[in-house]
Each structure stands twice: as structure tokens, then as C-alpha cells.
Amino acid sequence: HNQSRRQRQMCIRDSPFTDHPYIFELAATHGGVADEWHTDITFQDQPSIMSILHMVKCPEVGGDTMWTNLEQAFDELSTPMQQLCEGTTALHDAAPHSRPDIMAIHPVVRLHPETGRKSLYVNEHFTRRIVEMNVTESDAVLGYLTGWVKNPRFTVRYHWTPGTIAIWDNRCTQHFVLNDFEGERVIQRVTVMGDQVEAAAQPVAQPWVREGRKSATSRYDRQMRQYFRSRDQEAVDG
């Protein structure tokens, strides 16, 4: 579909890469430090299954990567909060890549296609809005969830050495880099593309879009209207 093609092209065009078209090389001195919790490219309709990272150069001290277990984070929510999350979806966009027009809507709780386990699927880097809530409610719930997944008991921290390779499942984890180092840090990354995200439950309400006069908070409503218009137009275009 057209939007998916644009998303793939954007990723390739806007990311530095080596001579191999599917290996992306990122250097800290050129802004390549992912120091915000995230799951890779959730702004795509079919986000990545997994990522493979090769550490080319790293500082002796600092620059560790942390991962958090989103299945455990969901399991340890209270039952009412689990039920609230399972009945909602969220809008993700590529604003950190200067492309806020590239958007996708995914369930807040997804099912792992191989294990059947449920996990939270929102992150502070790409997730903008819970679709079925107004802006104030969405900000409160997203703020809680994105803070909750950082709980130390869900996380692991790894200190790199040159030549190390890490592989992780993007369907049930988030990660981030501790930006606490000086000097250069160079990684090479391969991202394995995925399938449609499967929801743990169907949404319990229609999208909440504020109509009428514009306000400071209505930018999210305009963004959602843009998303739904684009989706409807793509359906018409076939």
C-alpha cells in the first residue's frame, strides 16, 4: 500500500547507511544516540519484528543500552488498568524523523503472534495520542504508561564492547541509550520488518476527535483527522 511504501522509502532515504542498503550506521557525533525509550519505527503500519545491532566503536565508560520487558509491564498492571488499555488504540508518528505526516494507529496492548502473550505497545518517542480519549485524558494515561515501563524491575542494562552483537524482539520490548559518555559511539543496525500488529482486544469506543473551534490542544485532533482522511483516500484509490 502507498503509505507503507512511503514509510520504507523515508527510512532508507533519511538514515545514514553503509555500502549495504539494509545496514544503517549511526554515529553519536552525528546525532545517532537514541536516548529516549522507544520501540523501533512504530510509526509504520507494519513495524519491525526485531533489530540486530553491531557495536563498531564505543566509549570505555557510559553509552550502555537498556531494554524493558513490555509483557511483564502489562502483567503487573492492575486488572482495571489492563482492561482500560486493552480497549484502546494509539496514534504513532515519525515526528522525531521530521516526518509527522507519516502515521500509524496500533493497539495499546498487542498480542505476540508466536507466544500469544500481551504487552504494552506505546512509547514516549513515537506515540502521540490514545485515539479513543480526549487530549487531557490521553496525556495522563500515556504519561503513566510510558513512565511505568521504565520501572527498574522490568529492565536490563548492558555495557558494550566493540564487536558485540545484540538481537532483540521489538514486539515486546523497548530500549534506549544512556547518553552519559564522551567521544564517539558508532553502531550498525539491521531492522527486520514485520506484519500487522494484532490487538489483544477490539476498541470499545469510536475515535475521539474534537470538532469546532481550534485550540492549543486541537493539533492532535487535526493530526487524527489527517490520518483518517489519508486512510479513507487510500481505500478509495485501492
Where are the model-predicted features located?
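Short, acidic/turn-prone active-site loops that include or flank metal/cofactor-
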Residues: 15-17
